[in-house]
Regions:
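GST-like domain detector, emphasizing the conserved glutathione-binding G-site
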Residues: 6-147
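Extracellular-facing binding/remodeling surfaces
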Residues: 168-173
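GST superfamily/GST-like fold recognition
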Residues: 174-178
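Amphipathic alpha-helical packing segments from all-alpha helical-bundle domains
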Residues: 149-167
């Protein structure tokens, strides 16, 4: 199946670390679409993203990233998913089919990222011994962990969950009718 996709889509390849939440987001997207694309695992735990050829390919030194046939690199999971949906896998749509629904989905994606995913990531990076001197994803390693960010992250996530619960009291889904 992957070989067949390689023939159809050329040399596009997803570089990923399956255990990372962002990478899982792309994998869930592809699973929902019932699609596969060629993939190469990058071992983030061993710092492989900081070594060549990956370091030159993606200046953010983060996963996942998608390399297109023309060598263009797209990083950030939502950007990858949006590109794949618009260019290769339009159905079933996950980003909406009308301007109103697209805007509504974007709104909720932003809220989930800003009020949930980012605070959670910051809390983990400021708590776990694995991230000492590595609180920012990528190449910076001079920023120290701050316990206050852990507490703030927990409070922000709790508030987001309350807002989602209130929304779901009146709606069957976060966005749309299916």
């Amino acid at each position: 199946m992957v070989f067949l996709l390689f023939l159809i889509m050329g040399k596009m390849k997803l570089y990923n670390f399956t255990l990372a939440p962002n990478g899982r987001r792309v994998k869930i997207f592809l699973k929902f679409k019932n699609k596969e694309i060629p993939e190469q695992e990058i071992n983030v735990r061993e710092g492989e993203q900081f070594k060549e050829p990956f370091k030159s390919m993606n200046p953010f030194n983060c996963v996942p990233f998608l390399q297109l046939d023309d060598k263009t690199i797209i990083s950030e999971s939502i950007s990858i998913c949006r590109y794949l949906e618009e260019e290769h896998f339009p159905e079933p749509t996950l980003f909406g089919s009308t301007p109103k629904m697209k805007a509504y989905i974007d709104m909720w994606n932003r809220r989930l990222e800003l009020d949930g995913y980012s605070p959670l990531g910051n809390a983990i990076r400021n708590k776990s011994s694995f991230f000492v001197n590595r609180v920012l994803a990528g190449t910076r390693n001079d920023i120290k962990q701050m316990p206050e960010i852990v507490e703030r992250g927990i409070q922000m996530i709790e508030l987001l969950f309350q807002r989602i619960d209130q929304h779901l009291e009146k709606n069957k889904f976060i966005c749309g009718e299916q």
